[in-house]
Amino acid sequence: MKAYQILEGTHKGTIYFEDGIQARIIVSKTFKEDSFVDPEIFYGLHAREIEIEPQPTVKIEGGQHLNVNVLRHETLEDAVKHPEKYPQLTIRVSGYAVRFNSLTPEQQRDVIARTFTESL
């Protein structure tokens, strides 16, 4: 299975998994998340492949939580140094959307440390 992010056009920013038969929408402004579409919709669009690592299935008692922030490490580091350049930078923290600049410096460092990992 492969993952892709669309980089241009109407579906810009859409992230989906594809197995050759169908595409599963992960994040999108134009498709319902967790829906399945014909992957041919995306053929010919400028996209980048996203590396994914399949993990063995582990039974977890209780809930799970994942915040997805599609950002570059350098962007957040620059936002710490030059907050005036990023007045609208919004990130997900504990299920809530928050302006990065409204966080304390300690909270910003914590977000950066937890957002960028070598693997899941």
UniProtKB/Swiss-Prot annotation:
Q: Name one GO molecular function term.
A: formate C-acetyltransferase activity
Q: Which residues carry this modification: Glycine radical?
A: 95
SUPFAM superfamilies named among the record's database cross-references = PFL-like glycyl radical enzymes
Transport keyword on record: no
Which keywords annotate this record? Answer: Organic radical
Q: Entry's PROSITE patterns?
A: GLY_RADICAL_1, GLY_RADICAL_2
Whether Transport counts among this entry's keywords is no
Q: Name one Pfam family in it.
A: Gly_radical
- Family matches, as Gene3D superfamilies: 3.20.70.20
Q: In what residue span(s) does the Glycine radical domain sit?
A: 1-120
> Which InterPro entries does the record cross-reference, listed alphabetically?
Auton_GlycylRad_Cofactor, Form_AcTrfase_GR_CS, Gly_radical, Glycyl_radical_cofactor_GrcA
Q: Outline what the protein does.
A: Acts as a radical domain for damaged PFL and possibly other radical proteins.
Instruction: Spell out the protein name for this chain.
Output: Autonomous glycyl radical cofactor
The record lists the organism as Enterobacteria phage T4 (Bacteriophage T4)
- What is this protein's gene name? grcA
